[in-house]
Amino acid sequence: MNIHEYQAKRLLHTYGAPIANGVAVYSVEQAEEWAKTLPGPLYVVKSQIHAGGRGKGKFKELPADAKGGVRLAKSVEEVVANAKEMLGNTLVTKQTGEAGKQVNRLYIEDGADIERELYLSILIDRSVGRPAFVVSTEGGMDIEAVAEETPEKIVTVAIDPAKGVTDEDANKLADALKLEGGAREDGLKLFPILYKAFTEKDMSLLEINPLIVMTNGRVRVLDAKVSFDNNALFRHPDIVELRDLTEEDPKEIEASKYDLAYVALDGNIGCMVNGAGLAMATMDIIKLYGAEPANFLDVGGGASKEKVTAAFKIITADPAVEGILVNIFGGIMKCDVIAEGVIAAVKEVGLKVPLVVRLEGTNVELGKKIINESGLNVISADDLDDAAQKIVAAVKGN
């Protein structure tokens, strides 16, 4: 689960992280009212959407030369003018896709005199099985580009969960970020704070880009991105309350109600598969034969007829779907259950696109019999290769 920048910064501030004074607003009137409470004379007006690259993004409704989703303002009047342009409009960034995301709220905060911009994140380093800090002196930019062009400028420090952030760890991080004087003191205090927040709140990612050193020599969290482990949310009702459903795909929201692993994609062939590995292999082979998957959907190992029916409805609700591939290997999951679920869903919502079903494993013959005797126009496939070729051909009209 993701949260907005202003929510992430407030959360980190409760642990003691230094942030600027700021407020989230939902209207131009609120922007004016609350900007007057900030000291100024420099303000930052930030679009609040669940996507990176906001500063370089573009609003669909504005001229091509208009400013992006993060803007500086030197007066309350400029704050208001920017709010009028940003609220309600659609911001397109490298992470939103062409559709973009509508900006429904802004975060207005004090400006800062920046001397240096740094990068810091905490994530789970699966190569060592530990949380790890990833830091760089090249902050305020795309860290992926830094990793590709100048990987030597990225330093990773794995943390022993039994010890937490030790003095040695903190000094390694401070050295990697070239912190000195007051900035070093701030950093040595900040690193354990961030690690505590990461572990206590079951975060999967904590990213600060940039972490700034100001001209007064102090450190401040200028931007923050936080993602939480969905499997641990039951322990954090306070975090669940921060969820913004308007930022999520409606199909993914519906899938979560049935405990389905669903991710919407940009293709035209809907996929229903059991098992994440098989689901990814299915998407790969669809691409191999010249089409694009419309989704990742893993119904899991113990799906019921009702769960399969719900999955099918979610796939068919996507107007971009021109064909559906059901690919099931019955281990824990039984092929007859899948067959019954698919038939129930087709009878309920109708079948307007080609449907290819490949079943293998437990009760496969019974599953095939159920489908064959259903009277539905379903294309049967013998293996994954055959299934992918048939659905691609059906969609292309071959």
Swiss-Prot record:
Q: Which InterPro entries match?
A: ATP-grasp (IPR011761), ATP-grasp_succ-CoA_synth-type (IPR013650), ATP_grasp_subdomain_1 (IPR013815), Succ-CoA_synthase_bsu_CS (IPR017866), SUCC_ACL_C (IPR005811), Succ_CoA_ligase-like_bsu (IPR005809), Succinyl-CoA_synth-like (IPR016102)
Q: What does the entry list as the binding residues for substrate?
A: 274, 331-333
**Keyword annotations:** ATP-binding, Ligase, Magnesium, Metal-binding, Nucleotide-binding, Tricarboxylic acid cycle
One GO cellular component term: succinate-CoA ligase complex
Q: In which pathway does it act?
A: Carbohydrate metabolism; tricarboxylic acid cycle; succinate from succinyl-CoA (ligase route): step 1/1
Please, one GO biological process term?
Answer: succinyl-CoA metabolic process
Reaction equations catalysed? succinate + ATP + CoA = succinyl-CoA + ADP + phosphate; GTP + succinate + CoA = succinyl-CoA + GDP + phosphate
Between which residues do disulfide bridges form? none
Q: Record-annotated residues binding ATP?
A: 46, 53-55, 109, 112, 117
Cofactor remark from the record: Binds 1 Mg(2+) ion per subunit.
- Which residues does the annotation say bind Mg(2+)? 209, 223
Question: So what does this one do?
Answer: Succinyl-CoA synthetase functions in the citric acid cycle (TCA), coupling the hydrolysis of succinyl-CoA to the synthesis of either ATP or GTP and thus represents the only step of substrate-level phosphorylation in the TCA. The beta subunit provides nucleotide specificity of the enzyme and binds the substrate succinate, while the binding sites for coenzyme A and phosphate are found in the alpha subunit.
Q: Which PANTHER family match?
A: SUCCINATE--COA LIGASE [GDP-FORMING] SUBUNIT BETA, MITOCHONDRIAL (PTHR11815:SF10), SUCCINYL-COA SYNTHETASE BETA CHAIN (PTHR11815)
Please give the subunit comment from the record. Heterotetramer of two alpha and two beta subunits.
Q: Which family does it belong to?
A: Belongs to the succinate/malate CoA ligase beta subunit family.
Question: What is the name of this protein?
Answer: Succinate--CoA ligase [ADP-forming] subunit beta
The gene coding this protein = sucC
